[in-house]
Amino acid sequence: MDGNWLQRTELLIGSEGLARLQSARVAILGLGGVGSAAAEALCRAGVGHLLLIDHDRVDLTNLNRQLVATREVVGWRKTDAQEKRLRSICPEGDFTFTPEFYLPENHAFLFDWSPAFVV
């Protein structure tokens, strides 16, 4: 890591708490208003493993409510736009981006990843 960019988090929760965050596995279904904000917050908190799932593209109408949406990425897959954003915050993060629509019949990719939490 570049220095210890999570040192303030570590001061708050201790080194054991930070290690737990860095080993946590969280899946996020949808990168809209809630999912894109959750993804960024979890990344900035130090959660080390994120699975981000969304089949949609960034639209101009998303600008008013979605952190992933900027004019620069209109037309991009939301997973690609979110990857650009998260990697600029934490380039060493273990992020998996899946540009698919989650359905019961294709659930294997989610459960094979073994998340501790799903947003």
Model-derived regions, located:
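Glycine-rich adenosine-cofactor-binding loop
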Residues: 22-44, 49-54
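A structured beta-alpha segment of the ubiquitous adenosine-cofactor-binding alpha/beta core
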Residues: 75-117
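N-terminal charged helix/coil linker that caps or initiates catalytic domains
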Residues: 1-27
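A generic local structural motif
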Residues: 12-16, 39, 104-108
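Short, glycine/charged-enriched secondary-structure capping and boundary segments
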Residues: 41-44, 65-68, 110-113
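Electropositive phosphate-/nucleotide-binding environments in soluble metabolic enzymes
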Residues: 11, 15, 32, 36, ...
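Glycine-rich phosphate-binding loop and adjoining beta1-alpha1-beta2 segment
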Residues: 47-90
